[in-house]
Amino acid sequence: MSSEVRKVEKPWGYELIFAHTESYAGKILHVEAGEALSLQYHEEKDETLYLLYGEYDLTLEVDGELVTRTVHEGEAFRVQPGTRHRMVAGPQGCDIVEVSTPELEDVVRLEDRYGRS
């Protein structure tokens, strides 16, 4: 039995939400070249990100400091609740698979180039 895939437009690209149950969520983030998600953290949401296509710069909080590194196809990272993070797509854009707990609206934005709060 298939489930509905929902497309959600974002200022940086779009999300394809392919699963959202009371236990987990799954989506693909399509980020256009050079576009960025907000610097953010989640109070409850626990997520793992897998880079399917392209590359991106990941800024991730490590021991209280923000560290940035380039992520390449096939790499995965876990982002636990309370961890500040941001993704900026490389010159080809990127597609990221996100698997998480179900709290999709749990986003605390700290900085956002599109003026969202």
Where are each of the predicted segments found?
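A short glycine-rich, His/Asp/Glu-containing loop-to-beta-strand
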Residues: 3-45
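Double-stranded beta-helix
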Residues: 3-10, 88-117
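Short acidic-glycine-tyrosine-enriched beta hairpin
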Residues: 62-82
